[in-house]
Design a protein with these regions (language model features):
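Active-site beta-loop-alpha junctions of metal-dependent nucleic acid enzymes
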Residues: 144, 148, 166-189, 205
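Basic, flexible linker segments flanking DNA-binding modules
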Residues: 2-8, 25, 32-131, 227, ...
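C-terminal domain-tail junction helix/linker
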Residues: 43, 214-218, 240-291
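An active-site-proximal beta-strand-loop segment
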Residues: 126-164, 170-172
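RNase H-like two-metal-ion nuclease catalytic core shared by retroviral integrases
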Residues: 110-112, 198-200, 206-209, 220-242, ...
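Residue-level signal for the short linker/turn that defines the boundary of a DNA-recognition helix
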Residues: 19-20, 68, 84, 253
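Mobile genetic element proteins and their domesticated derivatives, centered on retroelements
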Residues: 11, 24-25, 35, 57, ...
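Conserved, non-catalytic sequence blocks in retroelement Pol enzymes and Pol-derived host proteins
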Residues: 44, 83, 128-130, 145-146, ...
């Protein structure tokens, strides 16, 4: 004979199909009042578990400085061995009024092309990269401070989405780009023969940049003139950086503060802790190590 809890479970399942509870209880020889009491106990356990999860969700939300929404928090909890649905995480976040920072719109920019750049091919168009160090995307973005502008050059791995080299300077000479690429090559010697893709800006068409690529056996690639989305991987990273690292005003107080914040974000957070949607919510470092 089935236990009362087994019968209550059957009653609940059949009731969802349209059968009346009184008829089911009578047919299965179960107490109707006992059935309702079992529902109350079940709801109480669920409520207790939900209350217990609130602290965990809030702790992760604050740990990631309001950068994580329900999907990434859910992945973090699963990684800790905590079984919970993404739907419940979202519900708890709404109850607590936790809302992740909204990503700023991705606004790709155009660059001025040179005659020399027009002869360089786009080697990444239509390609799918299957492991790290096959291709880097490079670009420059502006960093506003109350002390004036800074310029940030970076190179991101097409596969792992790891920032492999970056430099910050107060102007935009070609050395801004060669400096960030040199850092990438020192840290990741397996980049030899990789494709280095960029737009057609003057820093990327300079003699010293091309000479550096040739010396290291790297393949130069440039997007088509006026096609902004050719370099969307790193443009998207700039958008993420400015949403999650920059002040809400978009302007840092000092240049020193900006440099420190960007260093901390890339080295201590983005590369090693931030789950990336295109990597099945793995960290860039995890994608590198798993390849």
């Amino acid at each position: 004979m089935k236990s009362p809890s087994d019968r209550y479970k059957i009653i609940q399942e059949l009731h969802q199909q349209g059968y009346s509870i009184s008829l089911l209880c009578k047919t299965l020889g179960a107490s109707q009042s006992g059935y309702y009491e079992s529902l109350k106990r079940k709801l109480s356990v669920t409520k207790q578990r939900r209350e217990g999860m609130k602290d965990k969700v809030k702790m992760l939300f604050l740990k990631h400085k309001k950068r994580y929404g329900r999907i990434r928090i859910h992945r973090d909890l699963l990684a800790q061995g905590i079984k919970i649905s993404e739907k419940m995480v979202g519900s708890i976040m709404r109850d607590l009024g936790l809302k992740a920072i909204a990503k700023r719109a991705f606004r790709p920019k155009t660059t001025i092309s040179s005659a020399h750049a027009n002869s360089i091919e786009d080697l990444v168009k239509g390609k799918v990269f299957t492991c790290p160090n096959q291709c880097l995307f490079g670009d420059i973005t502006y960093v506003a401070t109350k002390e004036g502008w800074l310029y940030l050059s970076g190179f991101i791995d097409a596969y792992s989405k790891m920032i492999k080299g970056y430099s910050i300077e107060e102007s935009m000479p070609a050395s801004l780009v060669t400096g960030s690429l040199e850092k990438a090559l020192k840290r990741f010697p397996k980049l030899k023969e990789a494709i280095i893709h960029s737009d057609r800006g003057s820093q990327y068409t300079s003699h010293c940049y091309h000479q550096m690529l040739t010396q290291h056996g790297l393949k130069i690639s440039m997007g088509q003139k006026g096609v902004c989305y050719d370099n969307a991987v790193i443009e998207s990273f700039w958008s993420t950086l400015k949403t999650e690292c920059f002040p809400s005003s978009g302007v840092f107080e000092t240049k020193a503060e900006a440099k420190a914040a960007i260093f901390e974000y890339i080295e201590s957070y983005y590369n090693t802790q931030r789950r990336h949607s295109s990597l099945n919510y793995r960290f860039p470092l995890a994608a590198e190590l798993a390849a």
